[in-house]
From Swiss-Prot:
SUPFAM superfamilies: Protein kinase-like (PK-like) (SSF56112). The active site is at D142. The gene is CIPK1. ATP binds at L25, G26, E27, G28, N29, F30, G31, K32, V33, K48. CIPK serine-threonine protein kinases interact with CBL proteins. Binding of a CBL protein to the regulatory NAF domain of CIPK protein lead to the activation of the kinase in a calcium-dependent manner. This is CBL-interacting protein kinase 1. It comes from Oryza sativa subsp. japonica. PANTHER family: CALCIUM/CALMODULIN-DEPENDENT PROTEIN KINASE KINASE-RELATED, NON-SPECIFIC SERINE_THREONINE PROTEIN KINASE.
Amino acid sequence: MVNGEAEAECTRASLLGRYEIGRTLGEGNFGKVKYARHLATGAHFAIKILDRNKILSLRFDDQIRREIGTLKLLKHPNVVRLHEVAASKTKIYMVLEYVNGGELFDKIAVKGKLSEHEGRRLFQQLIDAVSYCHDKGVYHRDLKPENVLVDRRGNIKISDFGLSALPQHLGNDGLLHTTCGSPNYIAPEVLQNRGYDGSLSDIWSCGVILYVMLVGYLPFDDRNLVVLYQKIFKGDTQIPKWLSPSARDLLRRILEPNPMKRINIAGIKEHEWFQKDYTPVVPYDDDDDNYLDSVLPIKEQIDEAKQEKPTHINAFQLIGMASALDLSGFFEEEDASQRKIRFTSTHSPKDLFDKIENVVTEMGFQVQRGNSKLKVMKNGRGSKNLRNPSSFLVCTEVVELGPSLYVVELKKSHGDPILYRQLCERLSDELGVCKTEQIQRTESLEDDLESFDSGSSLPGF
């Protein structure tokens, strides 16, 4: 182990000795991104310097490995390039392509919307890059304008592959089963808590990006997350009539809520709107990056840490990596400070409320039931005042997303968090929602947010 650490320190010294490190480009929960210049060639790079202890403590080692492993596979002009990786005892260094034009999000925010000509050019690059990734067996799963960078020539670069899926993540049915993505860009089938085709869900996200580029605002948006899910699930959006007929047709075919009817990559490339002035991008040659073959000599340390530390997700990770929220297989945490949890279900509202009422009654809670809401209460020490410190109140609501699909929301107004956890565990057992370890995530989020408020800086990447 000592020899490995010494070798890692030499690797780090060798790497940093080849670069002149400059200003900070960004800061986050894992470390910083620094501007760097290669001393021998003068080429510009961005070096992501990550704190290994934080990665281990926040249980993000798998996500960092996934990002590195994915970027090793991808060598395309419209994908951010990973050039070099090194690790010391305390840090991980990722030397990335420097993209100096900012995010596509900023470009749209400044202009309001893009012309069809400019939007088409960028969309062609986006589809070329996504098609290339899919051919490599990589599904991004978090495509959005914030994860699409623009270089000084105005060309795009897809970034942030921390949530990407590789072929080994597919289930026996050939489908993905882990829900990732940002709410406004997530495909409706991903919300259904079933397996989904990663290529078709990426296409949906590309369609939302195209809509934003051409129209200037989101096709699906609402401050209420449940209402937003309803709109996405139903494909409830209006395509402006001032767009060209062919642009409107392509948007309609991409934003088709039924993935079996949605246009695929090949269909997009053959579409008349896409074909105009289209020149396919040629991927880079598969030149060897030999220094990537010895990436991260940290597996032994990570495996040891896994045996010592329980699985959980805390507030620092939540704020810094909000896109990693699981929106279906587990309670989706919108605002931990409000103790709100949600899950999807195919049970009817009546069945859901009947089961919830049976469980909470057995646990000694009182119930008030309405048409689409149910209150779970317990008075403290015989007091009729529900604001008594020892009292407990949880409000439950069921909202229809679509045919035979509902969102159940539980919101703890006040009360003992341990009692709330016990309630969640009982409900999860009865409804078959999630595993105990996932319930623990909710509890740790709640506790960590309270300690987080006392003094940490806001992460940014």
